[in-house]
Amino acid sequence: MSTKTIRIATRQSPLAMWQALYVQQKLQQCHPDLEVQLVPMVTQGDVILDTPLAKIGGKGLFVKELELALLEGRADIAVHSMKDVPISFPEGLGLVTICERDDPRDAFVSVKYHSLDELPTGSIVGTSSLRRQCQLRELRPDLIVRDLRGNVGTRLNKLDNGHYDAIILAVAGLKRLKLHERIRTPLTAEQSLPAVGQGAVGIECRLDDQQTQTLLAPLNHYDTEVCVLAERAMNTRLEGGCQVPIGSYAIWQDGKIWLRALVGAPDGSVIIRGERTALPKDACQAGVELAEELLERGAREILTQVYRGNPST
């Protein structure tokens, strides 16, 4: 009997390679006879580094090449950071597995300062995320917030070379790259509500490939799946891309799902927040209802302005 081989499409960045190797290891632990190969590739999002993501199509730029490899049969699965996964998929592809979530928080990273509160007025903080920018500007309107692109190493180098006084990165990414010592302070969800799916790894494959889906099934983490799908349901109802000022974070609490969300103007002048509690079976519906509440309370106007390419910054 021939040994089944699974080919993993992945970006070449260190963090993406960590995620692919993580999935490779998990698959081989569950299926010792399985051969798992990595198919590294460069995406548009990795190449275009001089323009904010919001102006060039958002984080979907990080997955299109991987999806093309799936559709053309050059790979069997694609591994993504869930916060980079768009709300819709090409025909024939779908999200079939969500692995156990790591720490979803944002991290305050600085050479000189230990916390956001310590930053002097006029300090320069780097982040390319509109979600982080709007919350930073609300918390500390006296700071200067500037775009920061590139992989984690590039961003840290820019910080170390004095271009920024502090930068905001994902805790999970720093931990995965064994750079946890660079984290000065994790930001609470109240300070910086995470992105949809932040901290989780998702696996996409062809929907007609039942054999591969069966092999992937043991990697799915139910508790994480319920939370991330609720966050994504909220984002889908908002018609939010991956690079918009939207945050959403769900956790289990006393057997129920507690979902929080926000939509903010990039300048931090207005942030609409809301929350819902629901049974796990109703979590996605709660996400939709929360999105509708936010839209009614002013999120629609904020998103319309952002999508017109005229954020109030």
Swiss-Prot record:
EC number(s) reported in the record: 2.5.1.61
GO CC terms in record: cytoplasm
Residues modified as S-(dipyrrolylmethanemethyl)cysteine: C242
Keywords for this protein: Porphyrin biosynthesis, Transferase
GO biological process terms held by the UniProt record: protoporphyrinogen IX biosynthetic process
Cofactors: dipyrromethane
One Pfam family this sequence matches: Porphobil_deamC
Gene3D superfamilies: Periplasmic binding protein-like II, Porphobilinogen deaminase, C-terminal domain
Signal sequence annotation: none
InterPro entries per UniProt: HemC, Porphobilin_deaminase_cofac_BS, Porphobilin_deaminase_N, Porphobilinogen_deaminase_C, Porphobilinogen_deaminase_C_sf
Pathway: Porphyrin-containing compound metabolism; protoporphyrin-IX biosynthesis; coproporphyrinogen-III from 5-aminolevulinate: step 2/4
SUPFAM superfamilies: Periplasmic binding protein-like II (SSF53850), Porphobilinogen deaminase (hydroxymethylbilane synthase), C-terminal domain (SSF54782)
Cofactor notes: Binds 1 dipyrromethane group covalently.
Catalytic activity line of the entry: 4 porphobilinogen + H2O = hydroxymethylbilane + 4 NH4(+)
A molecular function GO annotation: hydroxymethylbilane synthase activity
Family to which the UniProt record says this protein belongs: Belongs to the HMBS family.
HAMAP family per UniProt: Porphobil_deam
Additional remarks: The porphobilinogen subunits are added to the dipyrromethane group.
Function: Tetrapolymerization of the monopyrrole PBG into the hydroxymethylbilane pre-uroporphyrinogen in several discrete steps.
Oligomer status and interactors: Monomer.
Protein known as: Porphobilinogen deaminase
